[in-house]
Every structure is written in structure tokens, then in C-alpha cells.
Amino acid sequence: MNETINAGGLPVMPNMQRLKGEGIWFENFFANSFRTDRGEVAILSGFPAQTRMSIMKLPAKSRNLPSLARSLSGAGYATCFSYGGDLNFTNQASYMYATGWQQLTWQKDLRFDTPPADWGYDDAVMCDWFADRVIALSGKGEPFPAGMLTLSSHRPFDVPFSKFDDKELNAFAFSDECVGRMVDKLKASPAWDNLLLVLVADHGYPWPRSLSFT
């Protein structure tokens, strides 16, 4: 993320740059893997990513991992997670349910005027929908963690947005725009007064392309 905020001097992620100054920015915090199925487990269960194995695909193992959702659920929090694509991919839904996420919402549950892309609904519709969901949950007066996985900054990088000729940078800029609008919508709502918002990458991506993961 550090490399793409101003890639080559280009303002690829101006909203993330803005948010850096409004919250706590961890300069040397890096995503734990190169794939979502590994990175999610690292984030939500504190289990280091494996290079050749996806723990998410091993229910007998993953259900016994520590879990942020399970801990919060035990403390009285209502847990929910959302994704604009298919949560059955790489066994995500099974892992989520097994580790304490009580309510999952994904592509099969959603209907928007905008048709889904290759991976699912793009970040524009999902970020707007998610902001509304958080606002509604906040209005109930009960504690909750609500998670969402974005998808537009993923190959094939086809997004309804045109800012940069480079498809990858353009997709990164699109996701940045969507997240920025989501944050602004939350800021303008009563939910913001009692909300902790955490933005984290699920996995790494070398940029520029010549840069190795190491």
C-alpha cells in the first residue's frame, strides 16, 4: 500500500493519503501473504500464512484456531462479514462460520442495478452498501464487528473507472475512491461517533511489477 499511494509520483490513492493523517498509520505493517485465503486467516485468527498450504481449506485445523470473531461473540458482540463475490471460494464461508462469524452476506444474497464483474460486485456498490449496513447496525445500539472484503483491486483489474492508463494503478485508484466515499458517508452519520474503523490489506502485491515480494 505504501508503494501505491503515490506510485511514481502519481496520486493513485489520495483518499488513503488523506486518511493517514486522520487516524493511526502503521508504516511498517505488511500483509502476511500473497493470497486472500492465507491473508484472511492471518488477520482474523493470528495464524501466519503458509506458502504451500491454505489452512482455510482444512476445517479440522481452522476451526480450532484463535478467532477475533469468536472472542467478540463471546463478549456479546453480534458478528457479521460481507463480500461482493462468492464466499464459498477457497472455503471462506466454512472458515468464517467455524470461527464465529454469525452472519455472512455475499453475492448470492445481494441485488444491485449494477451487474457483478468477474469476481462479484465492484467496490463502488459494495462500499456504499456496507456504509449503510454499518449505520443500520449502529442504530440498534448493540456492539458489533462488521467486516467486508473488497475485490476491485484484483486481477483482471476491470473497473468502471478511468483515471490511469495502467489497468492495475487504475483499479487501485478506483478502490481508493470507493473506500474514501464509504468513510465520508460514515463520517456524516451518527455511527461515526462510536466507530472504530480498521483498513488492512489481506495480501501483498509487488509494485512496480519488477519488485519481488522479498
Briefly describe each language-model feature range.
Residues 1-214:
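Solvent-exposed soluble domains appended to multi-pass membrane proteins
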